[in-house]
A protein has these predicted regions:
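Bacterial N-terminal signal peptides that target proteins for export
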Residues: 2-16
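Extracellular/periplasmic carbohydrate-active domains that bind, remodel
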Residues: 14-469
């Protein structure tokens, strides 16, 4: 009997030790692997704006004349090169209007546009040649240079309270889109054939250096693009009249976009589109755009799957959205996956804003979108749904790459007027999974929510037109 008691005591002791070790391991894991909003402080610690030498390089000292007519392209080239060779500093755009072609930045250069300074980009498309390594709608190609461009550089900035004006309009760039409201007319050249060709090249895995567009073709460049760069700051400037996407970092890391004003109503005039980027902060910006205000991307179709770099750890704080197709958007070019997106303390309000949170995809894109967080967002009027997750975007369900969307958390979001509160539509074979809404109020809703193929939709303290859901 004593032997049995002793054995029991050893068994109990071993069990207690096992439980204690399990608790210690669990606690340790919880402390080192934060989830949800608890991840934000650690991400913010990794996002550090670059610092620059206290040296100024005024473009007028390199031949620029600010009368809005003189071609200052070479003055910008010389100023950027001198700043770079000196170890970095600021390239100063003083008072005046400075006409230029493409500006290519180099490491340790801060392009600083003073309060009375304006950069005017040329309406001559040849000023954006030779072609550079870039992306058009999520596909790699050699095309017209983005208006401000950098490739494989680090410690870069665009700052100052001045204006950067792309001068795109219905006579230049915009009319390459087949839409009469943007100046296109029957018989004029347009982007459709080139766009289809690039899609085929990407799907056929044609080498990028053989995907040459530019002169004689009609794919528009982006406004600002940093490609494979790190340690970036864009702050205080105002952007106007872009050919298409405004701020478009690709394969970048450690980027801050702060207190930027974007007012541009052309076709595909998205405000800020991080693509395959990591550790990005978009804070206190104003968006009034012709397309999505912020759209997070990771490559389109075959190219996105080939490169396979997700966008992740992107924080959006304190922004104001007016016109646009969506306030915070993911997709549709997201074949390389998107995860860990945090949007908080934003205001969205315009009858010309379609949605507050939008995830758009289809079975040509594929990809996984997960861990999307939105809280403390005030929505006035949107014309469509406050929250829209839609698997039938554009081409619809015609591909072989079934998308996955899961873990979407929405808290303390209110709206005054919309067509729908929620429009959630996944596939039967791939339902939208785990959508959590808490403490939300959607008023002035005209139609019942559309919810199809959604698994684990949970609503706590959610009111639609005053009724608890």
């Amino acid at each position: 009997m004593k032997k049995l008691n002793t054995a029991n005591r050893y068994l109990h002791l071993n069990l207690v030790i096992f439980i204690l070790l399990g608790l210690i391991f669990t606690c340790g894991t919880a402390q080192t692997s934060a989830v949800g909003w608890d991840q934000v402080p650690a991400i913010l610690e990794k996002i550090v704006p670059p610092k620059f030498n206290n040296k100024d390089f005024d473009i007028t000292k390199f031949g620029a004349i600010g009368n809005g007519k003189f071609d200052c392209t070479q003055a910008f080239v010389r100023a950027v090169e001198a700043c770079h060779q000196a170890g970095g500093g600021r390239v100063i755009v003083p008072s005046g209007e400075f006409l230029t072609g493409a500006i290519q930045l180099k490491s340790n250069v801060n392009l600083h546009v003073t309060g009375e300074g304006v950069i005017l980009f040329s309406k001559d498309t040849r000023k954006f040649l030779p072609v550079v390594y870039t992306r058009f709608e999520g596909m790699e190609c050699m095309n017209y240079s983005p208006f401000i461009y950098a490739y494989e550089q680090e410690n870069l900035a665009i700052t100052g309270s001045g204006v950067i004006d792309g001068q795109a309009d219905n006579e230049t760039w915009w009319n390459w889109v087949v839409k009469k409201e943007y100046g296109w007319k029957e018989g004029l050249p347009n982007q459709e054939a080139d766009r289809d060709l690039l899609l085929k090249m990407a799907d056929d895995n044609i080498p990028v250096n053989e995907r040459v567009f530019g002169d004689g073709h009609y794919l528009r460049p982006n406004f600002i693009q940093f490609y494979k760069c790190k340690n970036i700051l864009i702050e205080n400037v105002t952007l106007k009249r872009s050919p298409m996407w405004e701020i478009h970092p690709v394969l970048c890391e450690n980027m801050t976009v702060r207190k930027v004003t974007i007012v541009s109503h052309g076709p595909n005039n998205d405000g800020c589109n991080p693509e395959s980027c990591r550790n990005v902060l978009i804070k206190d910006c104003y968006f009034d755009t012709g397309d999505d205000c912020i759209a997070i991307k990771s490559g389109r179709n075959g190219d996105g799957r080939r490169i396979k770099v997700p966008s992740e750890n992107i924080i959006i704080q304190g922004c104001r959205m007016k016109d646009g197709h969506g306030g915070v958007v993911i997709g549709s070019e997201m074949s390389g996956d998107v995860r860990n997106i945090f949007a908080e303390n934003c205001i969205m309000d315009s009858p010309n804003l379609d949605r507050a949170l939008r995830i758009k995809t289809n079975s040509l894109r594929g990809g996984v979108v997960e861990n999307i967080y939105m809280r403390d967002v005030t929505v006035g009027v949107v014309s469509d749904a406050v929250v829209r997750i839609y698997f039938y975007y554009a081409e619809g369900d015609v591909g072989q790459y079934t998308p996955v969307v899961r873990n979407v958390y929405i808290e303390n979001v209110s709206s005054k007027q919309s067509k729908y509160a929620l429009l959630l539509e996944g596939y039967e074979r791939s339902p939208i999974a785990n959508v959590q809404l808490k403490n939300c109020r959607f008023d002035g809703v005209k139609k019942s929510s559309i919810i199809k193929n959604v698994r684990d939709l949970n609503m706590k303290d959610v009111y639609i037109n005053g009724e608890l859901q």
